[in-house]
Amino acid sequence: MALDKDLASIQEARELVSAAYSAWQLWSKASQEQVDRVCAAMAEAAFGAAERLGRMAQEETGYGVAAHKKLKNEFASRNVWESIKDIKTVGVIGRDDARKIIEIAWPMGVVAALTPSTNPTSTVIYKILIAVKARDAIVLAPHPSAVRCCYEAASLMAQVAEANGAPHGLIGCMQNISLQGTNELMNHKYTAVILATGGTPMVRAAHSTGKPAYGVGPGNVPVYVDRSADVEKVARYIVASKAFDCSTICATEQAVVADMPIGNRLAQLMQEQGAYFTSESESDLLRTLLFNPDGGMNTATVGKPAITLAGMAGFSIPNDTRVLVCRLNRVGKEEPLSREKLTTVLGWYDANGWEKGCERCIELIQFGGRGHSLIIHARDDQVIMAFGLEKPVFRIAVNTMGTLGAIGMTTGLMPALTLGAGGVGGSITGDNITTYHLFNVKRLAYELSAPPAAALIPGEPVAGPGAREIEAVVRSVVEEILKIR
């Protein structure tokens, strides 16, 4: 008799984790040369399959643009591998002769990796590379709407890894997805660490297991455009960034905060790039379409082109429209469009001066993107530094596309598709998660100085009262109590 879906999912999780643990016991003894050979081969194979996997991801999920998913797959393979290939993850990885410290890498074990529907194959490629480079095993749990493409990406990398000497079972991917199966994966006794990329409920579940977990927070990313900015460049960047893969990367700009002296010019230039500024009635239609009564986003609108959204909402726009822009004046529950919008809809706020712009950005971050990211366009270094010092976020991308800058494609940040939101955002780190986060470091610490003399002198023994003394005290107390009565 066939198992029901939940039981089949639980059993699959158990089998994959057990196989991964057995494989990890072998892989943990691999040399640096073996690790790097396997990872390089996987990165090359994934890069070569980027177009096919991108097309599969778009067709299966219905989100985004296949050509942009291809670029994300190339980033997850080429850029991520280039950033970690020279990192030592085996044996002695560091020496400090002055402090007499020797550092030794130690793998964590089995990584339970939860992946989203918005960036499915690219996240699979990235997580496998950073885990295997750290000498970990990995078992992936894809989003239910992206199982086929994720399994294809994981299978490709597993086959290449095994062909280059990695043990069978080192890389696993669930196909029978259920809440119960995912919970079994995260809570399994052999799971060492959880790497969760996805919605807030999933990340909270990962943090509630009692296991070490790297999770992400929501990214309600504001972009401040200062009067000192190169406005023509900014207009190109904002529209291109928001339209990239139909805004499915969590670091995508969610609201423009425009310094008033350049606001009209910026709006005009963005229109020339394909931005359509909605009327108030059209904005109302989008509010109703994009968000459910409970405030959650309508998943049918995620990752959709602007022309599709307008049609769903019930109004017409030019066929060459890339982004819908809604002018807003409030932030909070009473303004749904001030939330994160993983689709081609962008908020717009006017601000008179960088101080007011700073305040508005903080409002947006506190409402839905604490710890995540912020974008600033300015040529005034004092304004840029003021934003860096005051904003409760851990990535501030300067004069670049938010989508590509925050993940490390166009900046010096570590290339990553899991972006920590720090303590203020409910994460353990504000880093772009990479292979460093998936192995521990042991330290040999040699004596630098002799211990203080007082630490070597035997202390006088401290003798407590004996049994007879205690009995006498108790008897005396009891007698006093009886006298009072």
Indicate residue ranges for each PLM-predicted region:
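N-terminal Rossmann-like NAD(P)+-binding subdomain of aldehyde/semialdehyde dehydrogenases
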Residues: M1-I102, I130, E272, I484
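Short, well-ordered beta-strand elements within core beta-sheets of diverse protein domains
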Residues: Y21-S28, A112, A255-A258, L342-G353, ...
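ALDH superfamily catalytic-core signature
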Residues: D6-L7, I125, V203-G332
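Conserved C-terminal structural/oligomerization subdomain of aldehyde/semialdehyde dehydrogenase
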Residues: A2, F315-R485
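Flexible, glycine/charged-enriched surface loops at secondary-structure junctions
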Residues: S28-E33, P167-I171, F244-C250, Y276-R287, ...
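Short, flexible turn/loop "capping" segments at secondary-structure junctions
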Residues: L16-S18, G215-G217, C246-C250, E335-L342, ...
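Rossmann-like NAD(P) dinucleotide-binding subdomain of oxidoreductase/dehydrogenase enzymes
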Residues: T89-K233
